[in-house]
Amino acid sequence: MRTGVRLGIDVGKARIGIARSDPHGMLATPVETVTRDAAGTSDLARIVAIAQELDACEAVVGLPLNLRGAATPSTDDASGFAERLAARLAPLGIAVRLVDERLSTVSAQGQLRQAGKKTKQSRAIIDQAAAVVILQHALDIERASGAAPGRAAEPEPQSGRADTETDVVQGEDTQ
């Protein structure tokens, strides 16, 4: 199993839950909830800052497929977010992967209910808990298979921007 801190990311319409792993990739724990930015800049900037603060080697974004495994509008939203995040993290050497997250929020809500937390009072916590479920699932897959979980998110092309910090040369997936 690869070593290094990984981030788990649960992308929602209003909030983004963030989790992290220990450096050995054994256990996922909650970090924070970031408010979703309609312009798509401050939320990405905060996640990049968290990745740098934690010296992350990878970010795992949950891919919300329906129960049959088909894409939904939420799937497209999460994929687009992952591509934009990959464009920001690639220059830092941090890979972004997409992992099936079916029922992660339902699982997180159930765990919080068992812990005596009320759903309406725990919305921000639910997002973090869902990120923990996504990341722990990815860690377990990697531990069982020996391969990186899910699929790589390709960086979104940075068309016409002079911002060299986020310009990315697309390369092959080496994971």
Question: How does the language model describe each region?
Answer:
Residues 2-7, 13-175:
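Phosphate- and other anionic-substrate recognition elements at nucleic-acid/protein interfaces
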